[in-house]
UniProtKB/Swiss-Prot annotation:
Enzyme Commission number: 1.3.1.33
UniProt GO molecular function: protochlorophyllide reductase activity
Gene Ontology biological-process annotations: chlorophyll biosynthetic process; photosynthesis
Catalytic class of the enzyme: oxidoreductase
Keyword Nucleus included in the entry's annotation: no
Protein name: Light-dependent protochlorophyllide reductase
One Pfam family in the UniProt entry: adh_short
Reported function: Phototransformation of protochlorophyllide (Pchlide) to chlorophyllide (Chlide).
Annotated family: Belongs to the short-chain dehydrogenases/reductases (SDR) family. POR subfamily.
Catalysed reactions, semicolon-separated: chlorophyllide a + NADP(+) = protochlorophyllide a + NADPH + H(+)
Keywords carried by this UniProt record: Chlorophyll biosynthesis, NADP, Oxidoreductase, Photosynthesis
Pathways per UniProt: Porphyrin-containing compound metabolism; chlorophyll biosynthesis
Amino acid sequence: MEQPMKPTVIITGASSGVGLYGAKALIDKGWHVIMACRNLDKTQKVADELGFPKDSYTIIKLDLGYLDSVRRFVAQFRELGRPLKALVCNAAVYFPLLDEPLWSADDYELSVATNHLGHFLLCNLLLEDLKACPDADKRLIILGTVTANSKELGGKIPIPAPPDLGNFEGFEAGFKKPIAMINNKKFKSGKAYKDSKLCNMLTTRELHRRFHQETGIVFNSLYPGCVADTPLFRNHYSLFRTIFPWFQKNVTKGYVSQELAGERVAMVVADDKFKDSGVHWSWGNRQQAGREAFVQELSEQGSDAQKAQRMWDLSEKLVGLV
């Protein structure tokens, strides 16, 4: 008897950290994972090391900092002929030590280009694929961060600066080099990351508003906890990479392992408990065994309907959708 096709999920940044262990958890649940990554050899190596069954994953190149790469990825995925049941926008870059911005292939500031604009285009292009999937329970999940949400303790820390999108003056002006900040003010690398993640959460809100009722697709964001040893911090001071995990494990008790964070991502993708759309899931930044997820309130900016609509309209122009 022919075996039914495994449900398919795309995970960006699945070669390390939360994305990799989210892929593992979903493979263990019987899913087929499209590992969307920049480095194909590295991705194959970690898939082999974790013992992923060969029929449980497909690796496709994706560089979110290059909009043409996003379009090529979507075309390559469609060649597989697999119905898309879920999309997880996990990949992110963080450059906390930069005094001057890095630029994407499209001449956008690299962290906003990768974390927000690349994912924004990917979500929009793959909406048709999610709609076409015959499964009734389809989900699009974007990872947020505590540092972009002032309703959580980690989001109240003012260093280097809190997220502030202004009125999107930088986006309005075209956001091309030398404009490096969404509000068109002086470049601050850590703030650029926070701004990009705030845009991620606004994107989730606007996806829900525009498409949930029509399509039934579940649109959510989540914060799986403080993964203090994540490769996201690879561009930070080596001393920070040593002290921060120790501090989270022994002082705040907020440390969450990459494995547990990946399991939490898989839960939001696959479990019936997480079928509500338009919410931000959190575990309260704690490792405790059996800790339950809850719907976390977002900041005023992250809950601002007008800001979400303006972000959407300007982002559509920046990625060439209009």
